[in-house]
Regions:
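Histidine-centered divalent metal-coordination motifs
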Residues: 26, 58-59
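Generic alpha-helix initiation/capping and coil-helix boundary signal
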Residues: 7-8, 48, 64
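Amphipathic alpha-helical dimerization/coiled-coil segments
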Residues: 1-13, 35, 84-109
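Short, hydrophobic-biased segments on the C-terminal half of alpha helices
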Residues: 30, 60-61
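Residues in the helix-turn-helix
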Residues: 55
Length: 109
């Protein structure tokens, strides 16, 4: 298998993104934002009912600090969307590998 280029900056970015995405709750948030629509915390809270608004806000803060999501304020509401196009590519690739690819479905236990 080919080795990835040994570029400190790119490895650092990849590590930061994967670390932030590696949490199942944050991964779920990103999947909800992957359609390109902005969503407020309250909208995300309705969709992801297993997280309190406080926990959801903390996870969104972590994603924002990692430059994975961006915010837009409209009056008192803050809307979130995916900032980094690479994150969308990663999400699509994972969907293809683990959901769309019939060969992968056969090999999973």
């Amino acid at each position: 298998m080919a080795r990835l280029p040994d570029l400190d900056t790119e490895q650092s970015k990849a590590t930061m993104i994967l670390r932030a995405m590696g949490n199942s709750k944050r991964f779920r948030i990103l999947n909800e934002l992957a359609d390109g629509q902005e969503r407020s915390v309250s909208e995300l809270e309705e969709i992801i009912s297993t997280l309190s608004q406080s926990a959801l806000s903390q996870h969104l803060g972590r994603l924002r600090r990692a430059n994975i999501v961006r915010t837009r304020r409209a009056s008192q509401t803050i809307y979130y969307s995916i900032e980094d196009a690479d994150v969308l590519r990663i999400l699509r690739l994972l969907t293809h590998i683990y959901i769309d690819d019939p060969a992968m479905k056969k090999t999973r236990h």
